[in-house]
Amino acid sequence: MKPQVFAATCALTCACAAIAPASAQETGPVDTVRLRFAWPAGTVARVQTTRFRETINETADTMVVSADYRLQADSHPEGLLVSYDDFRFPSAVGDSAASAMETVAQRAAAMVPKLIVAPDGSFLRIHDVASIRAGLDSMFVELMGEDGMAAMREMLNTVMSEDALTVMAAEEWNAIVGMWIDADLELGAVYQYEDQAPLPVLPDVVVPMLAEFMVEDRTSCVEGGSDTDCVTLHFVSWPDPDSVNVAIRRFFETLPAIPGADNISFEELDVENEMIIVTEPGTLRPHRVQISKLVSGVVKAGDERGEVSQFDVRTYHYTYAR
């Protein structure tokens, strides 16, 4: 499994250290939440999603992208075929450039890979890779021309390789559904485990990641509702600080050979990933999801120091037709 927050290589049913809050120890019987996958074939939902990103480096730069699409799960010989289609984007009135980009985004979104998942919900593979790659290739040729595309084809072949497309498709599924399958968690108890993942600013550098997760409460699947048919899952992870410092120091030791880079260094680097998922415990059908990543640090260049940060948040709201 490889959730967006970091590459989790064990399920939540692995040997994790559970730390029960004092309140749980002092009160009555334990409330165990049993998370099981049971999406029925024929599941259909509209999903509203928004991505917000703010980058601060002397000045602040923000980006907000919203979309609305259909999620559908159909029966498949190996389990379920999960597809994403009928993408809709906010109209850009009076802005031809923005309208053109919206058209491109709609075409690209229409080629989002379909997933094949096993009856137990585990991710198996993406469906029909060849047609996805052909469609993306055709779209880029139209945008850039054959000559411009020729210069980029090698890079795009890497980006659009079956392995790359599989990783991208699996990340979201595993973060929201896959990593929670068959976990039995005490309500209010905090669980911890350690894994390894690449640093956001140094993707070739792998460091230990520490994680905590819990079932916070039983809540309504509908925001503001009075029922308690769903649960709130909370997951936070961050890299081991000592390992980060060592990795950064070693990285910058290799930079003096690059002209102008010998006086640049990171004095601090902090990373925090967080997921909040409101889901049905008996089916793992999500209703509300928020996934965020904060990367911040202090960069030193000669005698000057500057703070840099990037905050990225994705939200999803699901409305089920059946």
Regions found by a protein language model. Give the residues of each.
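Bacterial N-terminal signal peptides
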Residues: 9-17
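Bacterial N-terminal signal peptides that target proteins for export
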Residues: 1-10
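Sec/Tat signal peptide C-region and signal peptidase I cleavage site
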Residues: 19-24
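Signature of exported/secreted
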Residues: 25-322
